[in-house]
Amino acid sequence: MYMAMLVALTLAFPSCNVEMELGNNTLEYRERTAYLCSYDWQDDWYDDYGLHHFQVLRFYTNGTGEDFIRIQDARGRWEEYTYTFTWDWYDAFYTSIRLNYGGGDYSYMDNIRLGEGRMECLLDGAAVCFCSY
């Protein structure tokens, strides 16, 4: 009798399967990657020397990206730099990204919060807020 009841309960509730999905094929991975790659992310700030920095990050779904930086002094002189990188989600919760610029040069974006056209994170330990455009 006990065995029959156990079999009946097992067959009656097949949809109660509890799973934990991690990796590149999960819905959360696809949603967060799609959101990240749907925008150019920009930030600007002044450093301790009065130089104005403007940065744009572009992420592509194939794991590549571009980092555009423009630095301008008080007299209006400026320099521009464009770097390419490969990127990947660096944790199973999709809150950290590793940027590989090549030659052993890495940057890390941690504690990422995405939403409402903003990406807030710690970029190499410094709190930053990128806005989408």
Where do the protein language model's features map onto the residues?
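Lipid interaction determinants
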Residues: 17-84, 91-133
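C-terminal motif of bacterial Sec signal peptides marking the signal peptidase cleavage site
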Residues: 12-15
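Sec-dependent signal peptide recognition
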Residues: 1-6
